[in-house]
Design a protein with these regions (language model features):
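Catalytic-core regions of core metabolic enzymes
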Residues: 1-489
Length: 489
């Protein structure tokens, strides 16, 4: 039997991205056959158990799990030592002055009159840091999730009174005066301002605009809950007002998942009072298509709609009776796929369902192996606790693809791959061989631009060589997947 090491550490917290990097570094060592270095959340414990590396006894989510399997005792000892070294390593910062600030207050004291603060700490600590920024008269982007909704409301009300903006919580995408923050793409500057209660929705829209030769002035993320009844569109209203005063913004597009109806009406009434024209790209059963919203905006601007980039795939491998399996990293893109697919397929189950009765939650977590038409948002908070976002770490989605292939269920696999700053530097490097090994008919919505670090065409070519049909438009990708299912039903 190969030797293993499984331990739990208390009083240790590390960022999920750093832990993913450590796992990759150790996993690349000769003699290491399995490794998981992660916070001991229920999802990560389930992954460890599937690897045969479950810890003995009870584990707590704030404990650090180190689980390893190696070819022999010497390799195991060396790997454990390498984990310890990687976790304790610090960059040579050169001087005490180079040590980064650990609070917003300290950062504001060090910086030369910043206009914007960024908060990316565990959710329970984010509120105090964001409040400090607001009190100092700065707008704040709260990347952190896990912030209670009542605290979100309090922060946004305080920001409104202070004349600043709260972007977030759980705001993963923004572009301010051409500066990309969080997950964002390299897009040209231009006259369109985006207000986005959706990160990947904003990325899809900004990338399609870029492909049409139209740039953006700003992308102001407001957090996925802002257009809920509980929050009431507080940040959306402030962001619309800010863009209305911006001379570089000639048109505004509001991007969101399905909003609460009464909040959508309130925002629509406020938008009608602005001097800058506002068009909505809020998803709903009646308006399920972000690409159509972009095309309508291009019409407003007098810009011809281009042929959206695509690569053909192998459609002849679709088995009879195939179902739709959507494995997404972006929540809004998953919603868009379900809204487009539901009229053709009927009920589509999901961990972020269109109706509560279609939820994949079993009471003990998300059923990632459910049969039938299924769309999974792997970026949902429940699947990212203690893990890096799937746009950074594809491990969980790759495991689901392999499990689907092994199940024998006939399916068309629909995926998103999101490029840009903050995302996996080469997603096709891991995904293409996984798709080839799975042997499934695959359709990919590839969200990005040629100027992104990963390069849209480079990624599209690699995925197409693996047999996938690739589309720049998620709506087009979804409809192509539905066509494949319909032709082989």
């Amino acid at each position: 039997m190969t030797p293993t090491h499984v331990s739990l550490r208390s009083g240790v917290y590390a960022d999920s991205v750093r832990l993913m990097q450590v796992s990759r570094e150790i996993g690349a060592r000769d003699g290491v056959s399995a490794v998981l270095v992660a916070m001991a959340t229920p999802l990560n414990l389930e992954l460890a158990a599937g690897m045969g590396l479950a810890p003995d006894g009870a584990a707590q989510p704030d404990q650090l799990l180190i689980a390893l399997r190696a070819t022999d005792d010497a390799e195991l000892t060396a790997a454990v030592a390498a984990v310890e070294a990687a976790l304790t390593a610090r960059e040579d910062r050169g001087s005490a002055q180079a040590i980064p600030a650990r609070t917003v207050g300290a950062a504001l004291a060090d910086a030369a009159d910043p206009a914007l603060a960024i908060v990316s700490v565990p959710g329970q600590y984010a509120v105090a840091e964001a409040a400090d920024a607001i009190a100092a008269g700065r707008s704040v982007l709260v990347f952190s999730d896990g912030v209670p909704v009542e605290h979100e409301v309090a922060l946004k009300r305080a920001a409104h009174e202070a004349g600043v903006l709260v972007m977030g919580p759980d705001c993963g995408t923004a572009i301010v005066s051409g500066v990309a923050l969080g997950f964002a793409n390299v897009v040209r500057r231009g006259p369109v301002g985006l207000v986005a209660a959706s990160g990947t929705g904003a990325q899809q829209v900004s990338c399609l605009l870029d492909a049409a030769g139209v740039g953006v002035s700003h992308v102001l993320g407001v957090g996925g809950r802002d257009l809920s009844t509980a929050v009431g569109g507080l940040a959306t209203l402030d962001a619309l007002a800010a863009l209305d005063e911006d001379p570089a913004t000639e048109r505004v597009l509001l991007v969101s998942k399905p909003p609460a109806p009464e909040v959508a009406e309130r925002v629509q009434q406020a938008a009608a009072q602005l001097s800058t024209p506002v068009r909505s790209a809020a998803l709903s059963p009646e308006s399920p298509d972000l690409t159509a919203a972009v095309e309508a905006l291009l019409g407003d601007l007098g810009v011809a709609v281009p042929e959206w980039p695509a690569r053909p795939g192998a459609a002849d491998a679709v088995p009879p009776g195939a179902v739709l399996k959507g494995f997404y990293s972006g929540g809004t893109l998953a919603d868009e796929a379900m809204l487009i697919a539901a009229p053709a397929l009927g009920d589509v189950r999901s961990n972020t369902p269109l109706r509560p009765e279609l939820d994949l939650d079993t009471g003990q977590g998300t059923d990632l192996r459910a049969t039938g038409h299924v769309v999974v948002d792997f970026g949902d908070d429940a699947l990212t606790v203690g893990r890096a976002h799937p746009m950074i770490d594809p491990t969980l989605r790759l495991e689901a693809i392999a499990a689907l292939a092994q199940s024998g269920e006939p399916a068309v696999l629909l995926l998103d791959v999101v490029l840009g700053h903050g995302a996996d530097p080469d997603p096709a490097a891991a995904l293409a061989p996984a798709l080839q090994a799975a042997g499934l008919p695959v359709v990919v919505a590839l969200v990005g631009t040629e100027a992104d670090p990963q390069g849209w065409s480079r990624q599209a070519d690699a995925l197409a060589e693996a047999g996938a049909a690739v589309y720049a438009s998620n709506a087009q990708a979804t409809r192509y997947a539905l066509d494949l299912i319909g032709e082989h039903a």
